[in-house]
């Protein structure tokens, strides 16, 4: 029922989700466990005097798991004597939010997000600043005026105050439109591109002022490639402020963390340090268990394969697979995944790679191509 509603009546689905968050925010008996834990923790006198560093949490994307993770790190830093402050989204970037899809994020989805985050920061007594509070009407007018000067075809080349914002927003627009290539002949695409660029101009100005005023020692954020985070990342880097980016890992309760770069989940920089180190028996057992879990379709954050077919004979019959032929496998990603950013090296695009590969094998009846689609 949940998936049916979300697919066929998204407005009503997100309205119900918003009501659920509203109810569980204020009703003590049915309140989220996370809120109850926050209440208990916030009342304890375990926070030291703020004598160490000042850490800024940039939380433009604040779905529940990200917000919970941020708050755990936030409290851990405060316990160790650090001062923390947070920039959160109060709906300011609804037209350019990566949790939305063309033409903009659903109204009640945005309201649900704001409700949960505002309650979280209220209970935990966060030092919170909302995005819309960081600029005024004049900033909004200026951003519209600046971006309106550019022709549609020139949007990818837009620079503002030395920042290549036309490039920085590309990952977000691909994700927002669920495309691999941005079509500047399409009116809706151009409108969305301009929305992201206008938001970027406002953010660069407001983030610059904020960092100058508060002077954090470090900035902690999700990913670092998507639009709002990318603007904060670049402005902070221009001021030599240390930035830590993170992403949820492939296994449950694991994370990737990166320093002074947008997240890179395919990094081999440290391989030379570990390649000659022999695994212990415990590590070998853990690795064997993990490989077995993956073989069974488990060991992931989401259960992509609740009803996985394991009978090879049935699979081969269904898809006409002939094991006497030489077999080639293709593993495409989602075409708008941020991990594909700037790695179109040998083909014009991710989609072009798939199409050309299929066309090649059409003319090779002695071989067969199996395409394993991304489970998302």
Describe the residue ranges of each PLM region.
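Conserved N-terminal ligand/cofactor-binding loop architecture of enzyme catalytic domains
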Residues: 1-58, 76-201, 248-308
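Short hydrophobic beta-strand segments
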Residues: 49-63, 217-220, 328-332
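A short, glycine/small-residue-rich beta-strand->loop->alpha-helix junction that serves as a flexible
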Residues: 59-69, 221, 338-344
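Short, solvent-exposed loop/turn segments at secondary-structure junctions
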Residues: 61-64, 91-94, 224-227, 249-252, ...
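Histidine-anchored nucleotide/phosphate-binding helix
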Residues: 64-86, 90, 233, 349-362
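Conserved nucleotide-sugar donor-interacting segment of glycosyltransferase catalytic cores
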Residues: 203-258
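Conserved catalytic-core segment of nucleotide-activated headgroup transferases in glycan assembly
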Residues: 296-376
